[in-house]
Every structure is written in structure tokens, then in C-alpha cells.
Amino acid sequence: MFHYTYNQEEIEIKEQISQQDVTYHIVVKSESMRSRVKEVRRYFEGNKDYTDVLFFSREDGSFEVIVRLNMIESFLIHAFRFKCLQSISWE
């Protein structure tokens, strides 16, 4: 599986794994991080597979992101690419 780190002063991430997907509950703590999360969202909303990664914005400003199991690696790599994550490792 994957292990990742992030700046806890800027973002909080909790994940919930099911048999078909992983749901990430993301609380953004800075406007610069909010912009980076939106870049990840734009990337996945702009590709041709509309069900690979689904973003939902919550009223409190947090995000719920549902990622198909076969897309977790891609999601984490792009979160790292847009500097939402500090590191990723495979275990």
C-alpha cells in the first residue's frame, strides 16, 4: 500500500478504504493549499475518465474525494505533483 506525508498546518487528510474505492476526507487550512487541491481537482475533471476520481466540496470548505482503487496511485502522484503532499512511499 501507500504511505504519504503532508504539512499538517496546511491540510488534514483522512482516508476510508472500501472494496471498490478509497474516500479521502480533506480539510484545507490555508488558501494556498486550497488552490493546490483545486489544481488536482481540475486535472482529474479534465481527463476523459469521469469516474476515476470524484471531488465533492462541502459547505464547511472541506472536500470529499472518492478514488477508484485502480486510480489511487495516480491520485497520490498528482497530489504530490501539485504539492498537496510532501512525500509518497510504497510499502
Per-range role (PLM):
Residues 1-16:
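Short, charged/polar N-terminal "headpieces" of proteins
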Residues 2-4, 28-49:
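Short amphipathic alpha-helix segments
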Residues 53-91:
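Short, compact, well-ordered microdomains
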